[in-house]
């Protein structure tokens, strides 16, 4: 029985390593391993615990109903030195749009522009191209405008398992205008972005 457990752990590790940045969903793992969800959850819990106990450079992370292997945060400084390149980060405009969409989704381009006070079409297209945002539907009414929302890649990049882990917006803020709302979005979102950099 112990040998079987070791084999399952090795197989899971190999699968997640091969999947890379995208990770694997519970459904994919259950299909490949031919196990029920309860058995999979037990196995993933055992693998995660093993990584935490040992002095390993990687850990098992669960996000948006998927699993992936990531390097541990304490070693991020070394990885940063390895992969650091100029202009790799997101622009202020991109962070503003991400903040607005993440808190207000689903949201149309015109609603984003109303909050920001400037055109945002190019920024939205750029964020869609980077797989941080995607089309999640169409608005009712004339023109059936595209509704934007965040993606699993967004959650992964910002170290979140779900959107409810975003920092809450203060409830006692008076809405004196859309600029103040945009500033509030950006301030909260930028703080989160800085914490995980």
Curated annotation (Swiss-Prot):
The keyword Cell cycle applies. GO terms for cellular component: cytoplasm. It is found in: Cytoplasm. Its main location: cytoplasm. Keywords: Cell cycle, Cell division, Chromosome partition, Cytoplasm. It comes from the Bacteria. One of its GO terms (biological process) is chromosome separation. Homodimer. Homodimerization may be required to stabilize the binding of ScpA to the Smc head domains. Component of a cohesin-like complex composed of ScpA, ScpB and the Smc homodimer, in which ScpA and ScpB bind to the head domain of Smc. The presence of the three proteins is required for the association of the complex with DNA. This is Segregation and condensation protein B. It comes from Bacillus pumilus (strain SAFR-032).
């Amino acid at each position: 029985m112990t040998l079987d457990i070791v084999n399952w752990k090795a197989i899971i590790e190999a699968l997640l390593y091969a999947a890379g940045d995208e990770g694997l969903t519970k459904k994919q793992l259950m299909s490949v391993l031919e196990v029920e969800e309860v058995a999979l959850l037990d196995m993933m819990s055992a693998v995660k615990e093993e990584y935490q106990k040992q002095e390993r450079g990687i850990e098992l992370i669960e996000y948006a109903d998927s699993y992936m292997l990531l390097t541990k945060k304490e070693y991020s400084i070394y990885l940063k030195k390895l992969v650091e390149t100029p202009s790799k980060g997101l622009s202020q405009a991109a962070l503003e749009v991400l903040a607005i969409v993440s808190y207000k989704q689903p949201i149309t381009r015109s609603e984003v522009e109303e909050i920001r006070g400037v055109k945002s079409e190019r920024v939205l297209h750029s964020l869609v191209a980077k797989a941080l945002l995607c089309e999640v539907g169409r608005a009712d009414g004339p023109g059936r405008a595209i509704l934007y929302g965040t993606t699993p890649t967004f959650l992964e990049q910002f170290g979140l398992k779900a959107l409810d882990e975003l920092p809450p917006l203060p409830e006692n803020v008076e809405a004196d205008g859309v600029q103040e709302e945009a500033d509030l979005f950006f301030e909260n979102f930028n703080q989160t972005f800085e914490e995980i950099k």
